[in-house]
Regions:
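Noncatalytic scaffold domains of N-terminal-nucleophile
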Residues: 1-104, 110-158
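Internal alpha/beta scaffold segment
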Residues: 145-147, 152-213
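Conserved small/polar residues in nucleotide/adenosyl-binding loops
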Residues: 214-219
Length: 219
């Protein structure tokens, strides 16, 4: 597997679901008007906010990745280096996109000018997402995965996200081993947990796919 292609290239991107998911959650559970909810984010994106120490460290850590793309370099760099603590981060384009989402709901993102810009950027950089993919996207309510670990009841995300199933698998395997409670960060504990994680993630690539198109078998 080409790690860079799988994790950092345009081929690693799926259709973004956050906008549609948040809109559906608002329609079902929200009380405030949709536009009013987005207003503060538009203001912050347009006027900017001061970079915190934590964000500055994160930008510095990821500076090589951010420098690869002119779009991210333009936003997160100043005078040849990433923004520092106290610098102002302004995101005018984000403010424009948020305004469209505030006015039109999901259509402000998945259709029209935003969708066309996403498709154009994808085509320039070897990505696959098209305006058709975006306009056809729909979020879905799904039943969460529930499982027990010792005296805890854990509720987490179902497929098509792999996280919940993998988490459940790892906890099931943890039930079969003994960890040193007095030394949680001991080398032996870390080795056992890392081996469990490796096994779980290797199984993910074999058995998991989108549930709308694939039947998942229980093992």
């Amino acid at each position: 597997v080409n790690r860079e292609l799988a994790l950092e290239s345009y081929l690693s991107s799926g259709v973004p679901g956050t906008v549609y998911g948040l809109y559906m959650a608002h329609q079902k559970f929200g009380n405030l008007p949709w536009k009013k909810l987005i207003e503060p984010s538009i203001l912050i994106a347009e006027k900017g906010f001061k970079i915190t120490e934590t964000l500055a460290k994160s930008l510095e850590t990821n500076s090589l990745k951010l420098a690869k793309r002119s779009s991210t370099k333009e936003i997160f760099f100043k005078d040849g280096s990433t923004l520092k603590t106290g610098d102002l981060l302004v995101q005018k384009d984000l403010a424009k996109t948020l305004r469209l989402i505030a006015q039109k709901g999901p259509a402000g993102f998945y259709k029209g000018v935003t969708a066309r810009k996403i498709q154009s950027d994808m085509r320039k950089n070897g990505g696959l997402i098209s305006t058709r993919d975006l306009s056809n996207y729909k979020a879905k309510f799904r039943q969460p995965i529930k499982f027990n670990y010792k005296d805890l009841k854990i509720v987490t995300m179902p497929p098509p996200s792999s996280g919940g199933l993998i988490l459940g698998l790892m906890f099931n395997m943890l039930e079969e081993i003994t960890l040193d409670k007095n030394e949680p960060l001991s080398a032996d504990n870390i080795l056992k947990i890392s081996e469990i994680m490796q096994i779980a993630y290797s199984l993910r690539s074999v058995y998991l796919a989108a549930v709308s198109y694939t039947h998942l078998r229980a093992h």
